[in-house]
Amino acid sequence: MTMEAKAILRTARISPQKARLVADQVRGLSAERAVNLLKFSDKKAAHLIKKVVESAIANAENNQGADVDELKVKTIMVDEGPSLKRFMARAKGRGTRILKRTSHITVIVGAAK
């Protein structure tokens, strides 16, 4: 059985479309390189994804005794979470609904073979 560790961040306050831009850059990289890339990105999603990747690395290290240098980001998924519905006043007494989207971010790290 291959060694894998998983970490999930649920209901992150960022739209899935914006989070996927960052997730696509990290997918398939070594864990150390992924964290380094995310550390120097100025996007909001990079900070959130970095925390999830670091959590997955810690899970692999603590729960399965994995060597951090051999880990790579096998899977990273950004799914749509529940939307927060907000109301914005418009002209002539009308209103428009605003959807503040959230994301579920899942990261799976495993041994690079």
UniProtKB/Swiss-Prot annotation:
It comes from the Bacteria. GO terms for biological process: translation. The lineage of its organism: Bacteria, Pseudomonadati, Pseudomonadota, Gammaproteobacteria, Lysobacterales. SUPFAM superfamilies: Ribosomal protein L22 (SSF54843). Keywords: Ribonucleoprotein, Ribosomal protein, RNA-binding, rRNA-binding. The gene is rplV. Gene3D superfamilies: Ribosomal protein L22/L17. This protein binds specifically to 23S rRNA; its binding is stimulated by other ribosomal proteins, e.g. L4, L17, and L20. It is important during the early stages of 50S assembly. It makes multiple contacts with different domains of the 23S rRNA in the assembled 50S subunit and ribosome. The globular domain of the protein is located near the polypeptide exit tunnel on the outside of the subunit, while an extended beta-hairpin is found that lines the wall of the exit tunnel in the center of the 70S ribosome. Belongs to the universal ribosomal protein uL22 family. The keyword Ubl conjugation does not apply. GO terms for molecular function: rRNA binding; structural constituent of ribosome. CDD domains: Ribosomal_L22. Pfam families: Ribosomal_L22 (PF00237). GO terms for cellular component: cytosolic large ribosomal subunit. Part of the 50S ribosomal subunit. This is Large ribosomal subunit protein uL22. The keyword RNA-binding applies.
